[in-house]
Amino acid sequence: MGNESGEWIMHGINWDNPDCIHSVDEAIKYINGFGFLPLFKNDIDGFSLEERTVPEYWWSDNPEIDPWMWRAIIAKRHDIVYGKFFDKKAGFISKKWLPVFANYRRDGYDFDALYDDGKAPNKHKKIMVNFMEDNADSEIYSNELKKQAGFGKDGEKGFDGAITNLMMQTYLCNCDFKKRVNKRGIEYGWDVAVYSSIEHIYGYDYVTSCYKDNPQDSWKQIVDYMHEMYPEATDKQIRKLLK
């Protein structure tokens, strides 16, 4: 998706194109087959869900054909993780590739160890305590998490940026999108992002299964794979999107 002369333009393909993804199940199959995929167009040509779908069907509110709705369906199924994983922008990582990304992005650190070594700010800790120890399996609405972590008018600033950074480090993901519920138990408003730890999706042992490897070796594995699948992509483009 690009802004051209003040107008947002979607880049995609026709329904009859053999490379077109037509349904959420086809999207899941493609993501699992490749391993990871940004949601929107980026500097690497063709490397996005946007460029493999019909532009006119985005935001059509039809779950059969709307890729914007697919992202929520995929997040809810907990087979593939969804979040801001690519240059602080949205995308998907398969279960197969998640440990590789986690080892590199976390530099082999669990969050508590990262914080204890002075490599994470206190505002990140205020968020992560809601997903650690007794809270390890929490799924929390974004508005509730913001309040619980002490962000807001008279508290910490930069909640959205902190969440994005924790996703980029693969500590958090969007595990669902749901409407809020009022005191009478009635849903209202727009769908709201729901966050969880990635360990909640795949389990701690699996997520950390590449910690035994050097994080730079995990990065090399990602880069080598991208060069194999997208030989026209430059090191600079790969580094910008995936580092």
Regions from the PLM with identified roles:
Residues 1-243:
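Long, low-complexity intrinsically disordered regions
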